[in-house]
């Protein structure tokens, strides 16, 4: 770099022609000089070209069709056919809209708005797994947030903008990637307000959180601290536009069937109390499919929040047969995972008898944990054998079968035959 002194010859930028006195810095190369202003201009041009390249790359990337999305979901999620179809179409339309965003912004008068998704279903029915599988298929950053830990900004608890901070961390602070990610907010039903009427007192973990999430979901510029942590007045922030982030909210909404039934009886749709058996899962699933926005509002979600979740998919409670399928059929089924784990122990084979699978499914049903509870039941069942196996030699197979009362599960260890020694000829 040349110094600004009176003793030396005056130097000029080779690009803009300004003298060293007119700029802050002048950097020298072999018979050439460039000023700080031209460097800034070059950096701006490069940044713009990189953004154009990223947009073009996204446009060229083949977006899986709804059929292809559904096929991938089928590999990991058992049942829930209606929910998978709804999700496949909604996610396809969302990312198709993002791919054609530049066309929309170039003079087209039709603006496509975002359709966020609400998943309603009992614990362990596959809500989180569906969202995770979609993010993995589309290769976009994905983060899960628990609505019960969120509070309004300024109160003790987790700020809603922390969700975007986690999303940014997932993609190594790549802002462009984060702005096309997926956010799954679980337990959304737990932030419903306690009554139909707006409360006079401040509800910082219920309606207040809905109001805060509303801005995030409909599209705002979130200010995220670059290194995480709490915000400070004098620090710089990374700006994240949430307009194109897909938000998927999930919740069990326990008791909403009574609200739907009450509305249906008034309107004469035919869900009479005499006809419905409370314990009949099929009837309950049928009722949930008739959910309307007014039912969600009566449950405790504010109308504006319901309006920002136009795509609603209901998931059925899993029955015994579905839980057995979940154990053995998906691409990463739990039984396949434990088989692989046992095979690492000197090639030991793990086998579950049919009655053992039935017993595991029934345990999960009795605990009301759905598919989520299957792993803990398997861990309990296999704990002793996994503890002893590394210390036992010559094991070829472990068989899990049900006990005499069909609820107990017991492992049977099968040893390999020792090879017979050949007789030496005299």
From Swiss-Prot:
Name of the gene encoding the protein in the UniProt record: clpX
Similarity section: Belongs to the ClpX chaperone family.
Quaternary structure and interacting proteins, as annotated: Component of the ClpX-ClpP complex. Forms a hexameric ring that, in the presence of ATP, binds to fourteen ClpP subunits assembled into a disk-like structure with a central cavity, resembling the structure of eukaryotic proteasomes.
A GO BP annotation: proteolysis involved in protein catabolic process
CDD domains per UniProt: RecA-like_ClpX (cd19497)
Species for this entry: Nitrosomonas europaea (strain ATCC 19718 / CIP 103999 / KCTC 2705 / NBRC 14298)
Residues given in the record as Zn(2+) binding sites: 13, 16, 35, 38
Protein name stated in the entry: ATP-dependent Clp protease ATP-binding subunit ClpX
Main function: ATP-dependent specificity component of the Clp protease. It directs the protease to specific substrates. Can perform chaperone functions in the absence of ClpP.
Database matches in NCBIfam families: clpX (TIGR00382), PRK05342.1 (NF003745)
GO cellular component: HslUV protease complex
Domain of life: Bacteria
GO molecular function, one term: zinc ion binding
Keyword Chaperone belongs to the record: yes
SUPFAM superfamilies in alphabetical order: Glucocorticoid receptor-like (DNA-binding domain), P-loop containing nucleoside triphosphate hydrolases
Binding site for ATP: 122-129
This protein's UniProt keywords: ATP-binding, Chaperone, Metal-binding, Nucleotide-binding, Zinc
InterPro entries recorded: AAA+_ATPase, ATP-dep_Clp_protease_ClpX, ATPase_AAA_core, Clp_ATPase_C, Clp_protease_ATP-bd_su_ClpX, ClpX_bact, P-loop_NTPase, Znf_CppX_C4
Domain ClpX-type ZB per the UniProt entry, residue ranges: 1-54
Database matches in PROSITE patterns: CLPX_ZB (PS51902)
